[in-house]
Amino acid sequence: MASKGAGVPLSRKSYRLTSETERPRVTGIVHEKLLNDYLHRIFSSPDHATPTATSRKPLNFQNLPEHLDQLLQVDSEDEESQGQVEGRLGPSTVVLDHTGGFEGLLLVDDDLLGVIGHSNFGTIRSTTCVYKGKWVYEVLISSQGLMQIGWCTINCRFNQEEGVGDTHNSYAYDGNRVRKWNVTTTNYGKAWAAGDIVSCLIDLDDGTLSFCLNGVSLGTAFENLSRGLGMAYFPAISLSFKESVAFNFGSRPLRYPVAGYRPLQDPPCADLTRAQRLLGCFRAVLSVELDPMEGRLVEKESSEWQLQGQPTVLLTLAHIFHRFAPLLHQVYLVEAVLMSFLLGIVEKATPAQAQSAVHQILDLLWLFMEDYEVQDCLKQLMMSLLRLYRFSPIVPDLGLQIHYLRLTIAILRHQKSRKFLLSNVLFDVLRSVVFFYIKSPLRVEEAGLQELIPTTWWPHRSSREGKDSAEDRAEAAEERPRRRAYERGCQRLKKRIEVVEALQVQILKLLLDNKDDNGGEASRYIFLTKFRKFLQENASGRGNMPMLCPPEYMVCFLHRLISALRYYWDEYKASNPRASCSEEAYIPPQVFYNGKVDYFDLQRLGGLLSHLRKTLKDDLASKANIVIDPLELQATTMDDLDEDEEPAPAAAQRPVQALAVGGALPLPRPGWLSSPTLGRANRFLSTAAVSLMTPRRPLSTSEKVKVRTLSVEQRTREDIEGSHWNEGLLLGRPPEEPEQPLTENSLLEVLDGAIMMYNLSVHQQLGKMVGVSDDVNEYATALRDTEDKIRRCPKRRKDILAELTKSQKVFSEKLDHLSRRLAWVHATVYSQEKMLDIYWLLRVCLRTIEHGDRTGSLFAFMPEFYLSVAINSYSALKNYFGPVHSMEELPGYEETLTRLAAILAKHFADTRIVGTDIRDSLMQALASYVCYPHSLRAVERIPEEQRVAMVRSLLAPYEQRPWAQTNWILVRLWRGCGFGYRYTRLPHLLKTKPEDASLPSLQKPCPSTLLQQHMADLLRQGPDVAPSFLNSVLNQLNWAFSEFIGMIQEIQQAAERLERNFVDSRQLKVCATCFDLSVSLLRVLEMTITLVPEIFLDWARPTSEMLLRRLAQLLNQVLNRVTAERNLFDRVVTLRLPGLESVDHYPILVAVTGILVRLLVHGPSSETERATSVLLADPCFQLRSISYLLGQPEPPAPGAALPAPDRKRFSLQSYADYISAEELAQVEQMLAHLTSASAQAAAASLPTSEEDLCPICYAHPISAVFQPCGHKSCKACIDQHLMNNKDCFFCKATIVSVEDWEKGASASATSSAA
């Protein structure tokens, strides 16, 4: 650095040392006296009084270096004593011992101070130990899980189950379980949270050990520590999987120093003194101005200082920075000196003044220091700033967070610094996403929420379903002032949080600036590259789980990103009227197939990208003018095939595979981890099936474009925004898309990334945060029940009253705490503004799906997460935000609901979508959609053509496809119209709990007559629609009920064994599911018979008789199994096993009764006679099963004991709240009708020889013969067999025809052909 003095004095970095004695004069330097006064004012000695002008030595730039040497001289004792402290053994630079002092698998940072658990319970210690004196070190808690932090000796041996504190000479504090550990464990301290700092103190003079949490002492934890020969203590930690911390042994200033205790690593005292003196000189430069005209010095505020290019000032600063720059490579000095100085500016000045001052200071750093020095200094500065922000305590006014964010903004406003930090630091070295996070306080009293929200309130839910008594209303009136006071406190909190959020949005606006491209790439395009890599690391399933961005950070980052994105989107709209506003935003479909945006290995709707490019290459050419080179396509395919055959060295370099060897591994810190998929993605993209040609004019429809997919790092601004008719990201526009641009292409990519972020982890985190609200509801219910018990408690039972009062106090205190926490959660996660952000994402996804659908087969290129986000964001708005804010108040809510309904109705059976998971998600979303009245009405509002197509898909045969959800949807459309089918929860179960009221299955019946009519019309239309659908329903009913009976037989056998045994809960769940399926299939049959009875009863149809016989057979089977007293079903129901709560007589019997009533009571007499004859002809029919429905006892068999008189019998008459009098009258009419008809049938029946009975069913006489094999059966059996199989039941020969057969006569005319 000393060689930089040559050259012109005022050139770039040429005036570092400008004594230049060989030159006769220096132009521009002030006269000697003023220069002497100025330099003495700047470089005054801090230890002595200011000498008089006559006694002090004259100063000029020739003797200034000598003066500086004297000024910066410190006591030699300070430097010599560095690292030579009694009571400490080991290196002076204290780090974690990743070579030998560990147990288990751990990930260690590059600086050897941060550690992440990667095994069950890993342990690591430091390289330095202490045996005498008072020592302290700090641990920055990054995650609040299971950890034991403290001290151990070198002889302690740990394993995957035992860590620090589990051996005799190791001591630990565990804030997760709020305990201290030394072989045994006792309660100690407070619970810690992510963002806290634990100070570990050891006093080896007194033999005590204690801890502090965020600077507050938790008291002495252990006494009488073992001391003496061979007893030295190492800092140590044991942590479970995915937990992470960072240590500060003294390499940085302690956040909470403790008087009398020394950090394990000594601070650089001598360099610190020098740096502080140089900083004082620098401050003096900023507060003094030269007035050459008057020949005097002018004092002024440092915030008003401007660099005006005066040679004297520049040379002075050059001398300061010549000494200051080498010191700023030390982390300790950057944080203790430079950071403190900059924070002081931010705290004292207005935001505008602070930004101007910081901007000038950064200008000076870049001017007087080498680039590598500035870059290293900025890197350390931002890392320190992020640590300060992340680990600062929450105070009522959030003042600390505001100061740190204001300084961050001031630094990022400096263009050169911003671009360097974006390119090399913000996403590569540190988790910059932390800057957008507002941590939730675990201890509300420390965050000052008690003062901010002095009055607490929580909703009092009535225990009565949907009914509020006068007492409840009076209580609500009494609570109203309290609720309003609570809401005012919440608003005060929200306003303070909004200040922090606004600063965070400012940071992102700076990072998304695209007008700072002078002298290099604009910030926005650097951000896009880093943002895409960040998404890739978090999207990859093979990434390192502990290194992924925590979901709570993602939530905050997403909301700030949406705010900044919409700001720039609408700003572009203001200057370009033809563009779209952010309310009309969507992602054009060509982004998904032109290869300009990397979607890594994420699944597309149509499957793998390589497969789609092969199968849809003709559609790409015809619709998007994109040609795929077959040779490159083949290369891509081979590259995918060879992916698993990587060379051994390459595979060994993968981080995940390297971890398998065990031990503590140095962990690189680019972002969260260099994703293992990055190499594959880039290799795929570089050999992708498209090559680039930039046309200079608009393309005609006959021209085809060959495009080449570029990796993220290779793209330029032109590749994104486009130029000279090259549309950039929008290359390959389909004819359905408008020509005018929506907005800047770079903003489209940011929007695409925001949608991907929501899918990665934001939705799951939104669901987790609802837990606080659930806790409030549970405690509120418990408090209400306790207060009721206190009111009912007899006065003489003072002991019970005391216990109840104690419980009441505990619940009240817990609710006070939770209600304040809930206010914080509502302000940071579930506010109205956050709800609008998620709603905006939902509408963006809907428009994107609609535009993609118009491209026909190219819709298959869309990533699956667009449909997932559309489904999940609506679910979040309804279930997570809905209890706090009404969805109906959202702008355009009804229209959005209808558009989502149209997408679900169209795409749940879309053949272009092949992924099983996404198809299941669509089906489940539609099933949930039809459960709620407002969303069901939205389905009814979609165009009739789409409604009919949806119902047609629902009526497709159930074979060879997932049919349970389809059947559930049909059942929901019928619920409320069926026989005794108006219940929300089964009659034998308890009433609905308030917290369960939002579940789809517990919604009140809301049938859709419109969709029922569509179903009836479709079943009447084609000759094959109804038979194929009903045949599949009957097959599934036969399977489901048979499986159910088989399972309850096993359960009954297990229950009757004398030895102790347990029934597998999974078996019980499957059993209950089969029962529910049987009931729902019966309900679908009831709906079909009610809507279109002629399918079964009009025997002019070729399949009606066969369907009716099969239906009668199944109904009799169900009735016989369920209605027989003291049989298998009856015994299992009386067991009331957990898991079989839904198994009961009522749901299945009323479903069967509904079908029988429709067949035998409603309709003309000719139809009822046909149904009656078929039902009675079935050999399984028993009249007692029908009598059972009305509670009539079964007549005892001869010699059998009479039934117990007090035995409770099932009867539909007992369910007056669920079955109307009219329905009961119909059952009685049906019973009378069947009693009469069965008596007549018994009198008219003739005995049949066994040889004449059908050899398949042994119930009906032989009436058909198969050709050509000649085997015989009844017509019902062969018709049913031919519905599913064309081979002979007996010999497996192919049946050509079936002919009528009568005993003693030859075959007659052919009745049907196979």
Swiss-Prot record:
Family annotation (PROSITE patterns): B302_SPRY, ZF_RING_2
Top-level EC class: transferase
GO-annotated biological processes: protein maturation; protein ubiquitination; proteolysis involved in protein catabolic process
Pfam family, one: zf-C3HC4_3
Positions of RING-type zinc fingers: 1254-1292
Catalytic activity: S-ubiquitinyl-[E2 ubiquitin-conjugating enzyme]-L-cysteine + [acceptor protein]-L-lysine = [E2 ubiquitin-conjugating enzyme]-L-cysteine + N(6)-ubiquitinyl-[acceptor protein]-L-lysine
Binding of Zn(2+) 1, residues: C1254, C1257, C1274, C1277
Protein name per the record: E3 ubiquitin-protein ligase RNF123
Lineage: Eukaryota, Metazoa, Chordata, Craniata, Vertebrata
Residue ranges of domain B30.2/SPRY in the record: 74-254
Region (Interaction with NFKB1): 968-974
Regions that span the bilayer: none
Function (record text): Catalytic subunit of the KPC complex that acts as E3 ubiquitin-protein ligase. Promotes the ubiquitination and proteasome-mediated degradation of CDKN1B which is the cyclin-dependent kinase inhibitor at the G0-G1 transition of the cell cycle. Also acts as a key regulator of the NF-kappa-B signaling by promoting maturation of the NFKB1 component of NF-kappa-B. Acts by catalyzing ubiquitination of the NFKB1 p105 precursor, leading to limited proteasomal degradation of NFKB1 p105 and generation of the active NFKB1 p50 subunit.
Annotated stretches, region: Disordered: 460-481
SUPFAM superfamilies to which the protein is assigned, alphabetical: Concanavalin A-like lectins/glucanases, RING/U-box
EC number: 2.3.2.27
Subunit structure of this chain's protein: Component of the KPC complex composed of RNF123/KPC1 and UBAC1/KPC2. Interacts with UBAC1 and CDKN1B via its N-terminal domain. Interacts with RIGI (via N-terminus) and IFIH1 (via N-terminus).
Keywords: Acetylation, Cytoplasm, Metal-binding, Methylation, Phosphoprotein, Transferase, Ubl conjugation, Ubl conjugation pathway, Zinc, Zinc-finger
Gene name, Swiss-Prot/TrEMBL: RNF123
Biased composition (Basic and acidic residues): 462-481
GO MF term list: ubiquitin protein ligase activity; zinc ion binding
PTM annotation: Ubiquitinated, leading to its degradation. Deubiquitinated by USP19, thereby stimulating CDKN1B ubiquitin-dependent degradation.
